[in-house]
């Protein structure tokens, strides 16, 4: 049986990413620059000769848009199974969804915990802090948040393994992918770039992290695009 491997992609850069707003369960489309970055990624994955057996994304518009571009570049649109899974959505920031990142992560949360920077908090502390400051009651506590993220990615791996293994292309979100990595090996990645690739292997019911935030596919695709422009 082939190795079971998940290629976890952070969606392309959106309007809210560009102007520094917390996106969470709210949604904005990819910008022109964001779309170009994902075309680069798709070309890079194609040039690497990777074969994908199935595709999954969250049910957010930005991940669906990202997946559409990648599948187009891979020539796989309509060729492999593709479904949405709300369990691999981004964290919900509750009443701060759509607010400026700085307000939440450099203002409210540091004041609540009396710290200098939000990176001093564990994911669990951050989740519980969001629940505390969320006036809408939408934010998820750590148990619920970590549980649905683990279940979402595990379901993909288990389905793929049952089908004989292979590669799955999964488009999700920065903090969601970071949380999954943390749940596997208790390391917390910071600043996963848009269009980055995190690779996770699954065997005998266990996950291992092969790489985090790899930008080499995008870089390779960008080089191909530049060469095509120069050749015109």
Stretches with model-predicted labels:
Residues 14, 176-177:
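Short active-site segment of divalent metal-dependent hydrolases/proteases
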Residues 110-144:
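Short glycine/proline- and acidic residue-enriched helix-loop micro-motifs
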Residues 42-117:
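Phosphate-coordination/substrate-recognition cap region in phosphate-metabolizing enzymes
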């Amino acid at each position: 049986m082939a190795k079971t491997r998940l290629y976890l992609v952070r969606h392309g850069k959106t309007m809210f990413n560009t102007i520094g707003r917390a996106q969470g369960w709210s949604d904005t489309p990819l910008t022109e620059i964001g779309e170009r970055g994902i075309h680069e990624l798709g070309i890079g994955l194609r040039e690497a000769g990777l074969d994908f057996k199935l595709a999954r994304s969250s049910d957010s518009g930005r991940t669906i848009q990202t997946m559409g571009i990648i599948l187009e570049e891979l020539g796989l649109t309509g060729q492999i199974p593709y479904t949405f899974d709300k369990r691999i959505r981004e964290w919900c920031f509750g009443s701060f969804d759509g607010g400026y990142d700085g307000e939440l992560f450099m203002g409210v949360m540091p004041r609540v915990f009396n710290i200098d920077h939000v990176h001093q908090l564990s994911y669990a502390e951050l989740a519980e802090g969001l629940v505390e400051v969320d006036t809408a009651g939408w934010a998820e506590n750590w148990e619920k948040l970590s549980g649905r993220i683990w279940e979402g990615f595990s379901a993909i791996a288990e389905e793929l393994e049952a089908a004989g293994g292979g590669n799955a292309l999964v488009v999700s979100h920065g903090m969601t992918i970071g949380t999954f990595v943390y749940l596997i090996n208790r390391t917390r990645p910071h600043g996963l770039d848009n269009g980055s690739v995190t690779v996770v292997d699954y065997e005998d019911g266990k996950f291992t992290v092969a790489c985090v935030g790899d930008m080499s596919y995008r870089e390779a695709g960008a080089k191909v695009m530049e060469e095509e422009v120069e050749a015109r």
